[in-house]
């Protein structure tokens, strides 16, 4: 485990890897990193606390010893630290929520630097606001900004992909209704950041409505 401030470039940086969800993202990323055919050859983790990141790396590596991953210090409230991250990777995976409170500076830094961005957000207002604010800059810089790469969206996306492959020829459905069922031997619980995101989303639903009314309507798919 290497705590560092400056240095090389990485295929992927996971921001917020010590958080509740970030630890699981890190655990899955380590599986890809250890696969010979994986395109991921170098990973770094970033956040406010090197100590917590070190603990997260140890947890995510169990039962194996933790690999020697660079640990970078960054804070969503510090734009210069975010710019530093973007300069060191082609892909930043953001796990710091609630995104309405912490996500906008990260998207802004990626869009300006031409760094590709992924997150696990399920917050419509955040996603639509950053699209409105940074779409043109991201296009000019060649940055892909992709939100909702988490449980809120991925199961439904996989279901739609599976459904679409069942149709033959030019036939295609114009609507898909998806249902998700969960099975687990353990009790299903949520974490505080997820709860906070939901509460803030409901409390500020009127702001999302105002945003949508202020934006030009997109044409419906034909």
Task: Identify what each model region corresponds to.
Residues 70-102:
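Conserved Rossmann-fold cofactor-binding substructure of NAD(P)-dependent oxidoreductases
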Residues 41-45:
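Conserved beta-strand positions in the Rossmann-like core of class I SAM-dependent methyltransferases
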Residues 103, 121-143:
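Rossmann-fold NAD(P)-binding glycine/threonine-rich loop
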Residues 7-34:
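N-terminal Rossmann NAD(P)H-binding glycine-rich loop of SDR-like oxidoreductase domains
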Residues 165-222:
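Active-site-lining helix/loop region of Rossmann-like oxidoreductase modules
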Residues 1-9, 36-38, 62-64:
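Eukaryotic N-terminal low-complexity, Ser/Thr- and Lys/Arg-rich leader segments
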Residues 46-50, 75-76:
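N-terminal Rossmann-fold cofactor-binding loop
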Residues 98, 107-127:
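ADP-ribose/adenylate-binding Rossmann-like module
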């Amino acid at each position: 485990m290497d705590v560092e401030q400056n240095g090389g470039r990485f295929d992927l940086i996971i921001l917020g890897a010590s958080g509740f969800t970030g630890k699981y993202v890190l655990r899955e990323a380590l599986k890809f990193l250890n696969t010979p055919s994986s395109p991921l050859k170098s990973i770094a983790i970033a956040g406010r606390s090197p100590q917590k990141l070190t603990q997260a790396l140890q947890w995510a590596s169990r039962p194996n010893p933790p690999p020697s991953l660079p640990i970078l210090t960054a804070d969503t409230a510090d734009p210069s630290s975010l710019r530093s991250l973007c300069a060191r990777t082609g892909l930043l995976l953001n796990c710091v929520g609630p995104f309405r409170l912490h996500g906008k500076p990260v998207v802004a830094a990626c869009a300006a630097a031409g760094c590709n961005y992924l997150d696990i957000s399920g917050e419509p207002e955040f996603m639509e606001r950053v699209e409105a604010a940074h779409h043109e800059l991201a296009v000019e810089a060649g940055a892909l900004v992709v939100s909702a790469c988490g449980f809120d969206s991925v199961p439904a996306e996989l279901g739609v992909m599976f459904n679409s492959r069942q149709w033959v020829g030019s036939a295609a459905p114009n609507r898909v209704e998806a249902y998700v069922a969960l099975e687990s031997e353990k009790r299903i619980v949520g974490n505080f950041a997820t709860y906070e995101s939901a509460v803030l989303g409901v409390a500020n639903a009127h702001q999302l409505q105002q945003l949508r009314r202020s934006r030009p309507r997109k044409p419906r798919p034909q």
